[in-house]
Amino acid sequence: MRNIILPAILVCFLISPVYCESFKDFQAKQAQNQEVFNKKEAEKKKNYEQEQLKKFKKYKTKKQQEYDAYRRSVNEKFAEAMKQKWTARKKNAAVPVPKSKEPPKPYVKNDDKRTTAVKLNYAKIVNAESYDDPEPITPVDLEIPEEEIPVNFEQDYKFLYHGTTCKAHFFDSMHFSLPDVSEATVSEVWKKLSSDDFDLLLSDCFDLKDDLRLGDWGYIDMLRVMSEHFLGEESNEAVLLQMFVLSQSGYKVRLARSGDKLILLVPFRTDLYTYPYFILNDGKKYYIIDKEARSQSRTYQVYETSFPREKTASLKMPGTPRLGQARGAGKLFQSRRYQDTFAEVVTNKNLIDFYNDYPVSGSWADYVRASLSDEIKNTLYPALRAQIKGKTKLEAANILINFVQTAFNYKKDVDQFGYEKTFFGDEVFYYPYSDCEDRSILFAILVRELLGLDVVLLHYPQHLATAVNFGNEDVYGSYFVIDGKKYVVSDPTYIGAPIGECMPQFQNSSAEIVKIN
């Protein structure tokens, strides 16, 4: 047996180098074949992707052509209808801001005795407005150029909006003039505006609205500033350009004429105070936004033709506008009961000016949803979070409500301004005084964003307070049951009162519940 095994081992030993060399060749050939295969697959994939991209570009070009054709058709019909005689309308006088009766003075709770907790009744529930942004008549940025269009921003037009540098493509060739404001002349200029020359400008305007987070009112106002910068303050050309961009942006707008002056008319989803208006053929109120135009004669001619899929503007804010910085002096705000709860806050004058021009609205939920600016959040929120860290939701809410109750001085709007004015959150930190509306709005913002709790506003006759849903946490105090959930009264103007305490004069009053979400 040994005589057989040993020769076999010797043979294997002698041929193994040959075998190994052949195996290496085999492996190399396999690797080479795999590389060739991979290259072919990569080439096939590349060809496939190029073919798909080619098809997609062809599709995009076709869709862009369809949109362009649709847009041309809409604007041509709009311009042709503009030649017809405009409708004579009479202006309605502006509705003044309602003067409220004497609001309750801040009620101070001087003892720690708790009142009896009761379930409270409410008169009705006001749901928050739901709203979709208007959509442009055509997506002008659908077809992306093969090469980036060269832009020399030193030659590009720039304009300032509330201290914020804005850029838009408005070149010399885009300038136009209106020798008169007859139907025929305005119609011809509208056709010029509808050309491809203005597509980049439209795209810039859409981007500015989103980038600056302006909301509808801010967008309308920004377009006024831009149009007047390019075409002259209070000029008819500026009004027509503003009207054109708004119509292409998807907004319901109309054009009026008084003598030799063109005037922009804009309806809103809520009534505006202090703005004269027209009631047009669709039954809506169309407001004269331009301050200078409000003093024109009562009789106007109005072009009332509508655009497809146009939407009515809203005063709802998508958030705090992103404006350039104009920092003022810092102010210290400190809680009276919780002395370690304080913050030095700096406000942005550009934002304050923006809010100061904002129409007075009775939609308090909009003020809450606008939140606070990042500048204030960056200093205020870390200070407040440090004090509520590790606390229960109730303990944290009591710290926040005492801060709002005692860190700010109280004065009625009429005494501070001579008229009713509701503050956005940042304004509470800017002006020397605030009232019940302002404090309730600020407290609602803080509770929603720092504690993540749902809040409703309580509208009593001449008073505004809040109620907070603490979820599963058992909280003592007077409360409402809304949609099967318990909301505990929290009054930022009842000085020194903890969560759950209702001002005595409102304990038996039925509040109107204003939802925020």
Each model region followed by its residue ranges:
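Active-site neighborhood of thiol-dependent amide/isopeptide-bond enzymes
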Residues: 229-242, 251, 411-465, 469-471
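Extracytoplasmic/secreted proteins, especially bacterial periplasmic and envelope-associated proteins
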Residues: 36, 69, 73, 240, ...
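Long, contiguous, compositionally biased segments that the model treats as domain-scale units
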Residues: 46, 57-60, 83-245
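N-terminal propeptides/low-complexity segments immediately following signal peptides
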Residues: 20-98, 103-109
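Secondary-structure boundary elements
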Residues: 172, 182-223, 364-430, 493
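Classical Sec-dependent N-terminal signal peptides that target proteins to the secretory pathway
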Residues: 1-21
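Extended, non-transmembrane interaction/recognition domains
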Residues: 225, 237, 241-385
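Hydrophobic/aromatic-rich core segments of domains that either
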Residues: 253-283, 384, 389-391, 438-517
